[in-house]
């Protein structure tokens, strides 16, 4: 009797573990936003900041990401943007929000002569309002839409 139960339960356990396990290591949209767009610990004073960060944050694997923006504010302040002014996203969606005040950002743009795998970026420090797409409950940033 015990062996029969084991023979029934074991395949079921294998199915459940096989189904749940891949989702444990999967990067959520909010996690990807943080990896791509948040650098609270830095103010990017180095002209090589973008070259270093784009590589470190895995945005130069397989190809050079043409443009990226890093926000140099606390995660709490960036999350707070999701409760600020609702604006239309560049793609027409209505889940974007604009920060009330200008935030410290670094704009990274691929230089014209740069070719993969040698991705070279121009680093530009700015103070601008940010626009982020937010999702979930509680609402958190999932995409950097623009700066203004």
Curated annotation (Swiss-Prot):
First-listed, main subcellular location of the protein, grouped into a coarse class: secreted
PROSITE patterns: RNASE_PANCREATIC
EC identifiers of the protein: 4.6.1.18
One Pfam match: RnaseA
GO CC field: extracellular region
Reaction equations catalysed: an [RNA] containing cytidine + H2O = an [RNA]-3'-cytidine-3'-phosphate + a 5'-hydroxy-ribonucleotide-3'-[RNA]; an [RNA] containing uridine + H2O = an [RNA]-3'-uridine-3'-phosphate + a 5'-hydroxy-ribonucleotide-3'-[RNA]
Functional description taken from the UniProt entry: Endonuclease that catalyzes the cleavage of RNA on the 3' side of pyrimidine nucleotides. Acts on single-stranded and double-stranded RNA.
Transmembrane segments: none
Signal peptide segment: 1-25
Domain of life from the UniProt record: Eukaryota
Name of the protein described by the UniProt record: Ribonuclease pancreatic
Protein family (similarity comment): Belongs to the pancreatic ribonuclease family.
Chain positions recorded as substrate binding sites: 32, 35, 65-69, 90, 109
Cellular location(s): Secreted
Tissue specificity annotation: Pancreas.
Disulfide bond positions: 50-108, 64-119, 82-134, 89-96
Keyword set includes S-adenosyl-L-methionine: no
